[in-house]
């Protein structure tokens, strides 16, 4: 049963720590009973006081004046006021005090009633009255004819009209006081009973609602065994009152202020975060192309104004390489062609193709978002660079490959437009830090003549990552021309650069040949490590030995290359792996690349006609190098599996090789 608003307005919140201030949630009848009893006591007290004072003023006898119970009337009035307060504030302490005063008033009322009744009987018996001056002296009837008894026992009443009327008025007043005191005693008794029942009910409620107090006592759970309350107590107390719980605090979604990730994201999208803007993890950022507006010559670097070239005209034929995250590593999953108006997702690889590979722009959103390195993605569509255009025409290649983002599937035949180099600049490092360019080793016929398109089965091209750079064979010198400023070619994946066999060697011929063979191969665990490599600047580029090659079930020695000393010193981090501890898997990959199962030929030319060719007809005197470095975190699951497969290669377990047009080949790291 729910309490009414008036009941709740009369009750205060209880304080468990203060037992005396605990209020009783009583029903309206019980509260009205307390109010009625208090008012009755106040009224009876006032009447007793009034009649007692009038009676004492009528008579001049000292015994009657002292027996008038005016003191009982004062106690009744005070007890009644406490009762009214207990109705207004039903605290346990107030109710207990009211019950105590009620018991005291009962005793005082009984004493006052006895005294008042005795004096009333005396006034009724003294019928023999005589006038002495202005006072009527009344004496009890005595059969003997003599005057009143001894002095002091007579009743003296103030003269009114007659002595009988004065005596009768005194008698009536005393009987009235006697009756009032008796009624006051009854009212005080009821008040004391009601208060005791309320206090007892409060104790019973405490025992029922807090049974754990008895369990924690010295006698254990047998200290108190309470029974269900009686129906009377249920009707008296509201035990089912609903107390609404405290409402929970308002919920606000977490706000992520500017951090390292948001800094990198602002760098990526060429935006500035002046104030901490709330970023929620469920909100996907816009696509790179939608923000940057990659159209024609706007695809140059974001932070290097030197790379902006007005002659860069790139027609947009987008090809998207979907990238999936495998425990922090980037794994190329699928390749598809989209129309010119399509926009790739944030983790896609954008290839700009028109007839030939003109521009490549690969957005590594995950890596850029998690690093604070100030690298940028740029695109150089100019035809000038390490690779010159060849007069040999070719047909436009079709954008598809298995591991890399910029690999044509089939070799371009004659009659097609020339291919320009693909530029993917991540950071413009100083020219004195030698970049590491990978190289391509081809087997050239001993006759020295080179054909326009070497047969794939007879001369399978191989790719690997040479951290020291490609060595220029003796006798091959670049033509005398003014070398342009070094244009570094960091790449999005582990597709190595291709070098020509001579000054007039055609790079595109070799490059498209390798891409044809790579398109026919299947990604395996031994080549997965190279397929996720990305190009960054390193302070050191150690020169690993060239891996062996096997073709037509024959093993051939691989020449050893000389190491090129590079400037040493601490290098800032350029990827997530560097930030996580200077890339702990770098040492494992370097050790694996430096291992060789057979000693290479120190002369640089093997028994089967391998020849090392130069990368570019110009550049720095000496050698140019392009270092391949993994974009993904090698501590992830897929990278660990690739390291384990690399361990198996190191212990002699060679992977299967695929044949293309009758030729057997193996992809080496």
Curated annotation (Swiss-Prot):
Principal location: membrane
Transmembrane feature ranges: 34-54, 67-87, 91-111, 174-194
Keywords recorded for this protein, A-Z: Glycoprotein, Membrane, Phosphoprotein, Transmembrane, Transmembrane helix
Modified positions (Phosphoserine) in chain numbering: 359, 390, 494, 575
Keyword Phosphoprotein: yes
Region of interest: Disordered: 387-420, 445-502, 550-571, 597-624
Record-level Gene Ontology MF annotations: WW domain binding
Pfam families noted in UniProt: CD20
Membrane topology designation: Multi-pass membrane protein
Subcellular location: Membrane
Biased composition (Low complexity): 399-408
A GO cellular component entry from the record: membrane
Residue runs in coiled coils: none
Glycosylation-annotated residues: 160
Keyword Transcription regulation annotated: no
Family: Belongs to the ENTREP family.
Assembly behavior: May interact with WWOX.
Protein name per UniProt: Protein ENTREP3
Source organism per UniProt: Mus musculus (Mouse)
């Amino acid at each position: 049963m729910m309490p009414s608003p008036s009941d709740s307005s009369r009750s205060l919140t209880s304080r468990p720590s203060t037992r005396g201030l605990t209020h009783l949630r009583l029903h309206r009848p019980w509260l009205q009973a307390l109010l009625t009893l208090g008012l009755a006591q106040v009224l009876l007290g006032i009447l007793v006081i009034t009649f007692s004072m009038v009676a004492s003023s009528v008579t001049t006898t000292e015994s009657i004046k002292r027996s008038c119970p005016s003191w009982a009337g004062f106690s009744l009035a005070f007890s009644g006021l406490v009762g009214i307060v207990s109705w207004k504030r039903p605290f346990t302490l107030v109710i207990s005090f009211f019950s105590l005063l009620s018991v005291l008033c009962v005793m005082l009322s009984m004493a006052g009633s006895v005294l008042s009744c005795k004096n009333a009987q005396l006034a009724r018996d003294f019928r023999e009255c005589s006038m002495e001056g202005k006072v009527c002296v009344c004496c009890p009837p005595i059969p003997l004819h003599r005057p009143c008894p001894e002095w002091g026992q007579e009743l003296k009443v103030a003269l009114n009209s007659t002595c009988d009327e004065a005596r009768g008025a005194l008698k009536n007043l005393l009987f009235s006081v006697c009756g009032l005191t008796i009624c006051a005693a009854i009212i005080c008794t009821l008040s004391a009973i009601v208060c005791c029942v309320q206090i007892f009910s409060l104790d019973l409620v405490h025992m029922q609602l807090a049974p754990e107090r008895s369990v924690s006592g010295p006698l254990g759970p047998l200290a108190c065994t309470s029974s269900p309350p009686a129906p009377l107590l249920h009707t008296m107390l509201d035990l089912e009152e609903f107390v609404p719980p405290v409402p929970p605090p308002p919920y606000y979604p977490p706000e992520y202020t500017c951090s390292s990730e948001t800094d990198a994201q602002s760098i990526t999208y060429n935006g500035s975060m002046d104030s901490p803007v709330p970023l929620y993890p469920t909100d996907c950022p816009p696509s790179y192309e939608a923000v940057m507006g990659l159209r024609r010559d706007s695809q140059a670097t974001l932070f290097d104004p030197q790379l902006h070239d007005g002659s860069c005209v790139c027609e947009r034929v987008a090809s998207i390489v979907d990238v999936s995250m495998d425990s922090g590593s980037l794994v190329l999953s699928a390749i598809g062609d989209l129309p010119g108006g399509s926009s790739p997702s944030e983790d896609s690889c954008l290839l700009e193709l028109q007839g030939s590979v003109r521009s490549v722009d690969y957005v590594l959103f995950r890596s850029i978002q998690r690093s604070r390195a100030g690298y940028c993605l740029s695109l150089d569509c100019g035809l000038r660079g390490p690779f010159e255009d060849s007069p040999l025409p070719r047909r436009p290649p079709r954008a598809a490959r298995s591991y890399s983002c910029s690999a044509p599937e089939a070799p371009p035949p004659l009659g097609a437009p020339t291919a320009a180099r693909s530029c993917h600049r991540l950071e413009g490092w100083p020219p004195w830090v030698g970049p590491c360019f990978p190289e391509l080793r081809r087997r050239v016929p001993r006759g020295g003549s080179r054909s326009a398109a070497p047969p794939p089965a007879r001369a399978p091209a191989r790719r690997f990552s040479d951290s020291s750079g490609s060595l220029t064979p003796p006798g091959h010198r670049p033509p005398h021309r003014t070398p342009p400023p070094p244009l570094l070619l960091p790449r999005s994946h582990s597709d190595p650069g291709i070098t020509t066999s001579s000054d007039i060697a055609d790079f595109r011929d070799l490059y498209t040949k390798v891409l044809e063979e790579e398109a026919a191969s299947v990604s395996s665990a031994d080549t997965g490590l190279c397929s996720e490599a990305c190009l960054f600047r390193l302070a050191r580029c150690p020169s690993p030995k060239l891996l062996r090659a096997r073709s037509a079930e024959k093993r051939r020695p691989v020449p050893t290359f000389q190491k090129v000393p590079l400037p040493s010193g601490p290098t800032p981090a350029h990827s997530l792996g560097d930030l996580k501890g200077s890339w702990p898997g770098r040492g494992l990959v370097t050790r694996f690349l430096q291992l060789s199962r057979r000693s290479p030929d120190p002369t640089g030319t093997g028994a089967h006609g391998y020849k090392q060719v130069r990368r570019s007809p110009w550049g720095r005197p000496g050698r140019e190098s392009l270092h391949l470095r993994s974009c993904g975190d090698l501590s992830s699951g897929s990278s660990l599996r690739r390291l384990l497969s690399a361990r198996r290669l190191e212990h002699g377990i060679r992977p299967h090789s695929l044949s293309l047009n009758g030729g057997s080949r193996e992809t080496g790291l």
